Amino acid sequence: MLDYMDYVQQCFDSAGRWKRQNSYGEVTQTPRNLIDFKIPDAVNLQVSNRSTKYSYNSLQLSTRQSINGSLTYLYTNLDAVEGLVKNTEELPLHDIVQTYELPAVTHHRKEKTNFHKCSLFYGKIFYPSSDVEAMMIKRFSPMNQVIVKCLSSLKENVNIFTAYFQRNSEKNFQELIVSSNDLLCGYRISHHFLRTPSKLNSSLYNNSSLFFGAEFWLGMISLNPGCSTSLKYCTHSANTGRPLTLTLSWNPLFGHISTTYSAMTSSSSTFCAKYDFNIYSIESNLSFGIELWRKTGALFKSEDSVEANRKEYEQNFYISHDHNLLPSKYGYDHEYNISDGKLSKEHKRNKIIKDLNHAFSTSLQKIDKEKTRIENFGNIIRNSHFTSVFKASTSLRERNLKFLWEGEYKNFLLSAGTELRVLKAEESELRRTSGQSSNSLLNEFSLQPLKFGVQIQFSS
């Protein structure tokens, strides 16, 4: 579950029409949300509120080892953020839980929006350690922004400064990163394929998308290089409209290859599988993750609006391409004189055009049905009132089990989870040496708790 300040920053990106999901760092975000989700390791209480129209603050207390906490302050001059940020009583659970990222259906209609330069300032101080975090986001244009992050720790004598120069165009997302830690320099780029509009109609959308990205790093002091490349393919099922995502990542220096498969089996369940392999050590790992949502009903029904949009889409398509605007002189209902050579040729030509239009319209109707199914499935998720979600994941090599429950109770957001490790029990070895045998798995294995925690959030 996102922290309150991360949620406000997400609203800042949405209000400024900045698509963070196009960056290279978000390529494998869905598998991380479903398999590598974070488990609270202590009792954590977070109280947040919006003090003014442009400022937000948050107080956090934790019992990790000892009682500690943090105080966070955020300021932004973007007016549209105020209308997006909601308190815990009104906030939909699906907007703050890190879950499956629905692939956006690509429309090719360019919307004209008025851009205003905006900024975001963030500061966080920890106590009793007095460590300080700071961040600044500055949007210079619809495609360019700069992010500056700082970390200072007096106890560890660490001061790190990192700057991100980002450019987000229609097909490319580029990042230039400079850090004071080892004078680290990096460059990230992700390119989006399958986003060119149709030659017949610019309003058509693509049911699938393909992302390819790479990153390159170099420490200027130690001269240690680093690089990786990733591929992501997102699409929807033509029969059900359910989305699925495939990713492939490769680190050539360390020989690590990772593949993932994520799919929504229904509007309230998700499955993810991840396979890791190292070509140098020949080690492998297989991980699984599931997600089950509980909902009480729909906020409102949208089938009528979806059907109206479908009819409007179909009508606009046929009007824009003049499929039935044949010359009235040679209409299909006219009597043709076979003896007239010219008229007979015109009749044959119009018949060929009619057959082509019929075949073409059949394909369009098929595309239109797929579009309706995809929109209906997305509307079911957006219009449903989810009250809780249960996550579970396991890894064969690490032999662990992770469970997480997140939900809402009255005006609070709750998160509770635990991580268990499967170990071979010592009693099983003693039974073997004494001649005793048992086929029970409970006698062969034991569960060791690694962490357990509860997080409570409240915002007004």
Curated annotation (Swiss-Prot):
A GO BP entry: establishment of mitochondrion localization
Its keywords, alphabetically, are: Membrane, Mitochondrion, Mitochondrion outer membrane, Transmembrane, Transmembrane beta strand
* Major localisation: mitochondrion
Q: Where in the cell is it found?
A: Mitochondrion outer membrane
Q: Which InterPro entries does its entry note? A: Mdm10
Q: What is known of its domains?
A: Lacks alpha-helical transmembrane segments, suggesting that it resides in the membrane via beta-sheet conformations similar to those predicted for other outer membrane proteins and porin.
Give the PANTHER family listed for this entry: MITOCHONDRIAL DISTRIBUTION AND MORPHOLOGY PROTEIN 10
Q: Assembly and partners? A: Component of the ER-mitochondria encounter structure (ERMES) or MDM complex, composed of MMM1, MDM10, MDM12 and MDM34. Associates with the mitochondrial outer membrane sorting assembly machinery SAM(core) complex.
Q: HAMAP family, alphabetically?
A: Mdm10
Q: Report the sequence similarity comment from the record.
A: Belongs to the MDM10 family.
Report the protein's function. Answer: Component of the ERMES/MDM complex, which serves as a molecular tether to connect the endoplasmic reticulum and mitochondria. Components of this complex are involved in the control of mitochondrial shape and protein biogenesis and may function in phospholipid exchange. MDM10 is involved in the late assembly steps of the general translocase of the mitochondrial outer membrane (TOM complex). Functions in the TOM40-specific route of the assembly of outer membrane beta-barrel proteins, including the association of TOM40 with the receptor TOM22 and small TOM proteins.
- Name of the protein: Mitochondrial distribution and morphology protein 10
Organism for this UniProt entry: Candida glabrata (strain ATCC 2001 / BCRC 20586 / JCM 3761 / NBRC 0622 / NRRL Y-65 / CBS 138) (Yeast)
> What gene is this protein a product of?
MDM10
